[in-house]
Curated annotation (Swiss-Prot):
Post-translational modification: C-terminal Ser or Thr residues may be phosphorylated. Phosphorylation at Ser-301 by PKA prevents maximal coupling to Gq-protein, and thereby negatively regulates downstream signaling.
Annotated protein name in UniProt: Corticotropin-releasing factor receptor 1
Residues carrying sugar: N38, N45, N51, N78, N90, N98
GO molecular function: corticotrophin-releasing factor receptor activity; corticotropin-releasing hormone binding; corticotropin-releasing hormone receptor activity; G protein-coupled peptide receptor activity
Region of interest (Important for antagonist binding), residue spans: 280-290
Signal sequence range: 1-23
Pfam families to which the protein is assigned, alphabetical: 7tm_2, HRM
Residues that span the membrane, as ranges: 112-142, 150-174, 190-218, 226-253, 270-295, 307-331, 339-368
Oligomeric and partner information: Heterodimer; heterodimerizes with GPER1. Interacts (via N-terminal extracellular domain) with CRH and UCN. Interacts with DLG1; this inhibits endocytosis of CRHR1 after agonist binding.
Subcellular location(s) of the protein: Cell membrane; Endosome
Length: 415
């Protein structure tokens, strides 16, 4: 351990020596360029800037163009571009050197790292926007008691599941350092289990959405007989034993790295991924049947309930592919092509992080019942405040001189 600081010091001294040798060679090269050039009159002397670019002897008032350096501090640059510097009219070099066109040539590893950082930013931005929209939608469903029915309670629980999933995503990102991954402590495994549980609940609540619509539209079963506890058992209850079984499998067969990722040849993750794919496929079948019925039997129907079903189906038609595409992308190999891999990373990051935003928009903000209830509340608030204003104005009108106040009567009786 004691030798490492000494080695670092030796390396630093060697680099310093090499840099000074390189700088002296550049100065000599710059002077030789200046001697070779024939410049008469007022001129700028040969100079090497901080980036190591040689600016040869040049006439005053001229913009000097020099190619970018091949290497600078170990970084390779594109030499087809140029740097610019002005030789001022008084024969001195301008302090500012324009190297904006000199772009570094990144290796494949550096490019992948840059794309990864951009994908992380997209993920953070998307999850922040999604969480904000989901919280607003949650509060609206909480406050608007007039629209509470089984259908909207399912929407509300789906939004709650997405809130919890987004919240645990932030916990994972902020706590799971490489050191924690390697230590495989108990709390980090619990965080992973919680994140996967809420991930599964998203799919089972989407299954609840499809199940409700299929029961109401295809089976023509009275929705009044449907109870919210049935859907609560499906959405929150069924995923729990699935995750418990997955956690037991991880504990015995793949107990490393906080249960993130998987060991080659171990398929414990399919314990929870399998049911997710299954309910996704069932939902696609439900949607196919629902759309078929709506297109044939209920096309001419104009009842308010049928209109609500159509709107719910439209929202589900949009959201289910969004949920499904992001999960099916997990099994897709983007290939070795650089462009396809970059597109895959960005596309998956965008859809994965903005899912909650789309759910809140389609099931809450564009929900006609929610919007109607908000308008009614707004009108009631306006009416209430206008009545208060009228009462306040009436109370502020001065009393007539002919009226006698109680205070004056009391004074006269006292006399």
């Amino acid at each position: 351990m004691g030798r490492r600081p000494q080695l670092r010091l030796v390396k630093a001294l060697l680099l310093l020596g090499l840099n000074s040798i390189s700088a002296s060679l550049q100065d000599q090269h710059c002077e030789s360029l200046s001697l070779a050039s024939n410049v008469s009159g007022l001129q700028c002397n040969a100079s090497v800037d901080l980036n190591g670019t040689c600016w040869p002897q040049s006439p005053a008032g001229q913009l000097v163009v020099r190619p970018c350096l091949v290497f600078f501090y170990g970084v390779r640059y594109n030499t087809t571009s140029n740097g610019y510097r002005v030789c001022l009219a008084n024969g001195t070099w301008a302090a500012r050197v324009n190297h904006s066109e000199c772009q570094e040539i990144l290796s494949e590893g550096e490019k992948s790292k840059a794309h990864y950082h951009i994908a992380v930013i997209i993920n953070y931005l998307g999850h922040c926007i999604s969480l904000a929209a989901l919280l607003v939608a949650f509060v609206l469903f909480l406050r608007l008691r007039s629209i509470r029915c089984v259908r909207n309670i399912i929407h509300w629980n789906l939004i709650s599941a997405f809130i919890l999933r987004n919240a645990t995503w932030f916990v994972v990102q902020l706590t799971m350092s490489p050191e924690v991954h390697q230590s495989n402590v108990g709390w980090c495994r619990l965080v992973t289990a919680a994140y996967n549980y809420f991930h599964v609940t998203n799919f089972f609540w989407m299954f609840g959405e499809g199940c409700y619509l299929h029961t109401a539209v295809v089976l023509t079963y009275s929705t009044d007989r449907l109870r919210k506890w049935m859907f609560i058992c499906i959405g929150w209850g069924v995923p729990f034993p699935i995750i418990v079984a997955w956690a037991i499998g991880k504990l015995y067969y793949d107990n490393e790295k906080c249960w993130f990722g998987k060991r080659p040849g171990v398929y414990t993750d399919y314990i929870y991924q399998g049911p997710m794919i299954l309910v996704l496929l069932i939902n696609f079948i439900f949607l196919f049947n629902i759309v078929r019925i709506l297109m044939t039997k209920l096309r001419a129907s104009t009842t308010s309930e049928t209109i609500q079903y159509r709107k719910a189906v439209k929202a589900t038609l949009v959201l289910l592919p969004l949920l499904g595409i992001t999960y099916m992308l997990f099994f897709v190999n983007p290939g070795e092509d650089e462009v396809s891999r970059v597109v895959f990373i960005y596309f998956n990051s965008f859809l994965e992080s903005f899912q909650g935003f789309f759910v809140s928009v389609f099931y809450c903000f564009l929900n006609s019942e929610v919007r109607s209830a908000i308008r009614k509340r707004w009108h009631r608030w306006q009416d209430k405040h206008s009545i208060r204003a009228r009462v306040a104005r009436a109370m502020s009108i001065p009393t007539s001189p002919t009226r006698v106040s109680f205070h004056s009567i009391k004074q006269s009786t006292a006399v």
